[in-house]
Amino acid sequence: VNYITGRRVSRIVERDGKVIGVELEPLNGQSNGKPADFIAADAVVSNCDVQRTNRDLLSAPAARSEQKSIARKYTPACSGVVLYLGLNKQYNHVSHHNFFFSKNSHEEFDDIYRKGIPARDPTMYIAAPSRSDPTQAPPGCEALYILVHTAYIRDGQKWDGPGGLMEQYKPVIMDKMRRMGFTDIDRHIVVERTLSPAGIEKMYNAEGGAIYGLASHGRMHGGFKPKNRSRVYRNLYLTGGSANPGPGTPMVMMSGVTAANCVLEDWKIPLPTEGGRSVAS
């Protein structure tokens, strides 16, 4: 196995009705007139968002058509706002994992899923990892991870920069924290980082900044995400939160196993069995 890190895939290369490998962006984004690095492959597995794979990494009209078909059937799942706070104080009322719920979940979900706006009274997940591992923060200090679900990015929404939604929404989050027992938190923040839906979209190529792939609304969509075998190319395979079986760490792991098994089946390679690889007798 050869791992190549710090390089973005610029496109999946297609020829004669199949994919033949991937092309990498130049180092530091500068080609200096040199051809792009190409990695040949008999099979390609994409763990990028399924819509982004079809729209941004493939060029065939059939891929664009498939992306539009997915967009008609599904909407992106919700996104999230993350605050990373380093504090010079500890708060004894929190454990490693903490939830602070909205007073009205119906209004919260209506804001996020129907109106497409940040929830006015959000549910918050707060992790204080130093409760389990004291080395995660200096003595007497705290490192907090704060996640608030919000709507995926709608047309015209600007999250980052002056006047953006992050600038407007962070006070809502901090106000709730003060009401949840972090009364003097503002004067104890020594390190602060934020991650917005726009940042998630850029970092992970996630459509609309969605953190759970495609939404599972409706009776059928929960169990019928896009298949692990691409409908466009027979030797292209899909995995991740927007592919079968869906989002969340356990199912994403299952998605990877399913995609790998599809490759093995299609290439007539015996599937692994517990304790070793199965072979014909």
Describe the function of each predicted region.
Residues 88-198:
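C-terminal segments that line or cap access tunnels to active or ligand-binding sites in enzymes
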